[in-house]
Amino acid sequence: MFLLIFKGKILSRIKQEGRWVQTLQKKSWFESPYSSGIILFLWNTLMTGVVAFFIFILTKVNIPFLHLVILGIGTIISIWAWSIFNIAWIGSRKNRFKMASIGSSFYAILGVYALYRYLTLKPSYPGEDLFMAALGLMAVLIIAVVALLTCFVFTGFPKKEQLY
């Protein structure tokens, strides 16, 4: 929630003349909302996969709260990338929404999958406690919804100075 409130301040830290922004603007695929949306979708998939991999690795290490650091770093890197997509986009508002919708749809798919798994959760043997599995699936669902909204807002709505 704080990220959405301070979106303008976060976006103001990314410069139009920055290396990453200029690199994206020079790419021919970035001009199309569909191809840039697919790249954003793949970026979100990659970041979620990397964070999930590190959290899986951390289950083997007995260091408490380190998973929160990994989640925080993944969130910061994702918001940084979404901000670069926002600043680098040159095109109509309608095409920006297309790009944001395609790119953030990964989190909608992840949320629907987590909801399906939660609703169809059954014990594998009689007496199995499913509390932790249900809690994990609810956490994935909440994270997916928050990431969906944050990604869409950061990539789909320009800074006020960018409106034309």
Each predicted region: which residue ranges?
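Alpha-helical membrane-embedded segments
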Residues: M1, A108, G136-V153
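Membrane-helix boundary/juxtamembrane motif in polytopic membrane proteins
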Residues: A88-L110, K159-Y164
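Membrane-water interface of transmembrane alpha-helices
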Residues: M1-R19, I79-N86, C151-G156
